[in-house]
Amino acid sequence: SLSQASYNFIINEALGDSYEIQAGRMASQRGGSQQIRQFGDRMVSDHTTLTQQLGMVLQTNGTPVVTPAALDPRHLTMINDLTVAQGPDFDRRYAIQQVSAHREAVALLESYAQSGDNPALRQWAMQTLAMVQEHLRLAQMLPGAAG
């Protein structure tokens, strides 16, 4: 069985992935610049993969966790902020959100990789960290990311 800390890690990771997929779809369809659209495509693809990998790690360990069916209020607000934005304003909001969301994801993964109490999850966090750090690096180069 999972500790509360591991359970919280999984839920936060799942919410982050879910937000990235939804926001990425919007960026892919509504992004004004090609850079934003391509980044959105990559987020959908990479975070779908991460969701599947995390599910496999949990299954292999016999710890099925029901991940949230809907976004939490904070991520929902972020999606709503994108929904009402148009054109360059959309690109700017998406870019700024992506930098902060990936900073948060890096911190979450680093923390669990260092002190998580489930070995399989810790290994997954370590492996995932490099990809998410790369996402952060790319997000920081998006047009409008500087605010």
Annotated model-derived regions:
Residues 1-147:
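His/Met- and acidic-residue-enriched segments that coordinate or traffic transition-metal cofactors
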